[in-house]
Regions:
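Glycine- and charge-enriched loop/helix tracts that form the active or gating conduit
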Residues: 1-123, 221, 226, 231-234, ...
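Charged substrate- and nucleic-acid-binding regions of tRNA-handling and nucleotidyl-transfer enzymes
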Residues: 13, 176-268
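Residue-level detector of short coil/turn "hinge" positions at structural boundaries
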Residues: 24, 75, 127, 144, ...
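A diffuse structural propensity rather than consistent per-protein peaks
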Residues: 25-26, 44, 146-152, 182, ...
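Short acidic/polar alpha-helix capping motifs at helix-coil junctions
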Residues: 28-31, 171-177, 193-194
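Short, mixed-charge aromatic SLiMs
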Residues: 32-45, 92-93, 120-136, 142, ...
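Short Gly/charged-rich anion-binding patches and loops
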Residues: 63, 115, 132, 206-207
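Divalent metal-dependent catalytic cores for phosphoryl transfer on phosphate-bearing substrates
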Residues: 83-182
């Protein structure tokens, strides 16, 4: 181990034998893994992330990652503190799909967005990986209201990640009694989300050109704010045609110069 610190990470990865279960190392190797962990500092961060990704996606991820936490390896590579029988780690095995960022998001649920940024830098995540991590992490702990219009807005803001977000919230609601919502609360929203069958890739019906023609608002921040407001209403009300937008425009008080309170697509 002392010659190749990357073997430390590979040893943990090898413990996960997939369908064959877990191979726990004998005591001599287990002690060596714990005592040589400072050597992980010598390895290129990208290589550590490459190994850690494979561990996170393993069939026995919860058991292996908890062992890494108990052995001090997780603290060494992520510079964050972990609990014994950590709920976040326990939930890794229950997560559907093979998106490794979802697994990081679950692990980092109780840490700050600053911690996530530092971890992204520490593990040298790609720009896309970092963007997905920060976006998803910011949504955790928030539930949309259980109404059709709010759920439509939620779905379009979240894109293809809406259902997975609710599934993750459901897991934490079941295992985290301190939350102010229950597993049933999340399930109701999940049922509504799936029932509505929302097109998350919907585009604004009203272009900037169209709004300028209808309102004589010149190009600038106010035009952008009105376009955002119209798109919000289009999604929330499930409008399908430009005629419906036309009718809507007659009912909105868009003449005021203060656009700070105008709705726009966002969650939370």
């Amino acid at each position: 181990l002392s010659e190749d610190a990357l073997r430390i990470m590979r040893s943990y990865r090898f413990m996960d034998q997939g369908a064959a279960g877990i191979w726990w190392p004998e005591r001599h190797l287990a002690d060596a893994l714990r005592t040589t962990k400072p050597m992980l500092k010598r390895i290129a961060r990208e290589r550590i992330w490459s190994e850690f990704k494979r561990i996170l996606l393993g069939q026995q991820a919860s058991e292996i990652v908890q062992r890494m936490a108990d052995d001090g390896i997780l603290k060494e590579i992520l510079d964050l503190d972990w609990e014994q029988d950590d709920v976040r780690i326990k939930l890794l095995n229950e997560l559907e799909g093979s998106d490794v960022i979802d697994r990081l998001v679950v692990l980092l649920r109780d840490f700050s967005s600053k911690d996530c940024e530092q971890l992204a830098a520490k593990l040298r995540l790609s720009g896309q990986e970092k963007k997905r991590l920060l976006f998803r992490h910011a949504k955790l702990g928030h539930l949309p209201e259980d109404t059709e219009s709010t759920m439509r807005v939620f779905a379009v803001v979240m894109g293809t990640w809406g259902e997975q977000h609710l599934c993750i919230e459901k897991m934490f609601a079941r295992d985290g009694p301190s939350l102010d919502y229950t597993e049933d609360d999340v399930q109701q929203r999940l049922d509504r989300y799936l029932r509505l069958n929302i097109d998350v890739n919907v585009e604004p019906l009203a272009s900037g050109e169209y709004i300028m023609q209808q309102t004589n608002i010149p190009q600038g921040p106010k035009l952008g704010a009105l376009k955002s407001w119209l798109f919000y209403e289009q999604v929330a009300r499930n409008l399908r045609t430009i005629d419906e937008i036309d009718t809507l425009l007659c009912t909105l008080s868009w003449q005021s110069e203060d656009t700070s309170r105008w709705p726009k697509l966002q969650f939370p």
